[in-house]
Each structure stands twice: as structure tokens, then as C-alpha cells.
């Protein structure tokens, strides 16, 4: 490839129709309020849509066979484990919320059927509760929300998954449930993976070992950046995302994130949400959260 004949095109990471929000919580059995909050929030969405005459008119004009419900709303909930998919989707259905599980443990036929019904907004398939196995190559325009049930392993992964919302250009919510318990759990897992990887790489030696070390260091730094993004309560989420990806002069979103909507109220919500957790961030702030190898 001749560099003199190539051109680079760089698009902005900013999508102003996405509303980013971090929900602070505890994932201990006593303090975990994620499910009750989620059900209440979803029920409010269903009620608003069902009682909106304009929405009913819009749906009737789109479909002549009355197969699409006025209150239907498409969403994705990302969870870390297959068991979480099954349990959470079952609990949502018990609360009369159409949800289906999608993970690698299902057969190809089951996954395809689930995906097709969700894309078609079939009854009972408003929401897909999925692991990260879901989403690649799927383009459903009217996804109104993406929820991360726990902290993802990387900033890039979070941004890509959240970006599956609102592809039709209309407003969509990107919610991330954040707890310091999750942060520490994922951090320990990454630290362990780094240790194991370094051990294998040292055995190989040479350039392979150096490349692996760089890769794992980048992985740790990406996760640290995402945890910092969640902890921040003093800046626009869109600005923080843009700066992570190297954009300059990203403007504040004007009410398309929790900071720009809530201001000082976000700090209080963080204090209240994380009050039951023990603050153990000193290691992270000293940048040795993942061990001495990346000091």
C-alpha cells in the first residue's frame, strides 16, 4: 500500500441522540436495587407509550394487520454470565415484561429464532437479555435502550454495545449499573488474566512476549478508564467518551447525559447509591490496581 495514495477518514464518536447515564448501586444481596428500579422504569415506559395517542396513530399507520403494539419498546440488557441471562429474563417475564435470553449455551436454531423475533418486535420479545455474544452484525434501528447490568471489561466494549441503541436517530438511553464491588471483581479477574498471560508469554520470549505485555497493559488501562468514567460526577459523559478515543474539543451534550441533566444532583445520587459499599480506591488512584507489572 502506497501511503501517498491513501486517505484517512475519521468520524466523531459523539452521537447526541444517546443519553448516557450511570446508575450507582451495590451488588450485595442486601443493597442490590437494580431489578426493582429496572422493572419500575420499564413499566413507566410501557404506560407512557400505551397512553400516547400519537404513538397509537403512528403504529396504526405503520402496520395494517395490527401486529405491532403501541406500547412495544425494544431494548438490550447485557449481563456477564449465561445464568444471569436465564434468571433475569425469567424474572422480567414474571413481571409481565417481554424478555428473552440469548447466549452461546442455546442452540443455533434457538438463537436465530430469538434474534428474528426480537428484530420483528414479536410479542414477548421486546427485550433481549444477552451476554456479549449478542449484537455483532445485527442492525435493529429502533432500539430505545441498552442496559449494562454490570461493569464491562473495557471502555471499547462498553461504547460498542451502548452504540447499538438509537440507530434510527431518535433519542435512546444507555444505562450502566455501576458498583465498586463489580469494579473490584472485574479488576481482580483482569489482574489474574494478566498474570497468567505474562507467564505464558515469558515462556515464549522475544517479540511475542513484548506484544502480549502491551496488549494486556492496554486491556488494564481501558478498564481503569471505564471505572474512572463511572466514578466521575463533574463532566459531560459525551466529552469523557470523546476524549478517551482521542477526540479534541468535544462539546458538552446539553442534557444528553446524567451530568448535564442533574449537575450537583449526580454527586448526591452517587453518594446515596454507593453508601453501603466500602471505598477501596487508594490502590486504583496510585495506578497499581492491577499489580506491580504496570507501575
Q: What is each PLM-predicted segment?
A:
Residues 1-200, 210, 249-250:
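Helicase motor core with emphasis on the C-terminal RecA-like subdomain
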Residues 142-143, 147, 151-160, 165-295:
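C-terminal accessory region of SF2 helicases/translocases
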Amino acid at each position: 500500500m502506497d501511503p501517498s495514495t491513501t486517505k484517512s477518514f475519521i468520524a466523531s464518536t459523539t452521537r447526541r441522540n444517546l443519553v448516557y447515564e450511570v446508575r450507582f448501586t451495590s451488588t450485595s444481596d442486601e443493597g442490590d436495587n437494580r431489578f426493582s428500579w429496572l422493572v419500575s422504569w420499564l413499566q413507566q415506559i410501557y404506560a407512557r407509550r400505551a397512553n400516547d395517542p400519537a404513538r397509537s396513530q403512528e403504529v396504526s399507520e405503520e402496520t395494517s394487520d395490527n401486529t405491532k403494539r403501541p406500547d412495544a419498546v425494544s431494548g438490550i440488557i447485557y449481563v456477564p454470565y449465561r445464568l444471569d441471562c436465564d434468571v433475569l429474563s425469567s424474572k422480567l417475564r414474571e413481571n409481565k415484561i417481554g424478555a428473552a435470553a440469548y447466549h452461546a449455551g442455546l442452540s443455533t436454531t434457538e438463537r436465530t429464532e430469538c434474534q428474528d423475533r426480537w428484530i420483528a418486535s414479536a410479542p414477548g420479545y421486546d427485550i433481549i437479555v444477552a451476554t456479549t455474544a449478542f449484537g455483532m452484525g445485527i442492525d435493529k434501528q429502533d432500539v430505545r435502550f441498552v442496559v449494562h447490568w454490570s461493569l464491562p471489561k473495557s471502555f471499547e466494549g462498553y461504547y460498542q454495545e451502548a452504540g447499538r441503541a438509537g440507530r434510527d436517530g431518535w433519542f435512546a438511553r444507555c444505562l450502566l449499573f455501576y458498583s465498586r464491588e463489580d469494579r473490584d471483581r472485574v479488576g481482580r479477574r483482569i489482574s489474574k488474566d494478566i498474570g497468567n498471560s505474562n507467564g505464558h508469554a515469558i515462556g515464549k520470549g522475544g517479540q511475542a512476549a513484548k506484544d502480549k505485555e502491551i496488549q494486556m497493559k492496554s486491556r488494564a488501562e481501558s478498564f481503569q478508564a471505564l471505572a474512572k468514567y463511572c466514578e466521575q460526577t463533574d463532566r459531560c459523559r459525551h466529552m469523557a467518551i470523546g476524549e478517551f478515543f482521542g477526540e479534541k474539543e468535544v462539546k458538552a451534550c446539553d442534557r444528553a447525559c446524567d451530568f448535564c441533566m442533574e449537575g450537583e444532583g449526580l454527586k448526591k445520587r452517587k453518594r446515596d447509591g454507593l453508601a453501603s459499599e466500602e471505598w477501596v480506591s487508594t490502590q486504583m488512584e496510585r495506578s497499581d490496581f492491577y499489580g506491580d507489572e504496570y507501575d
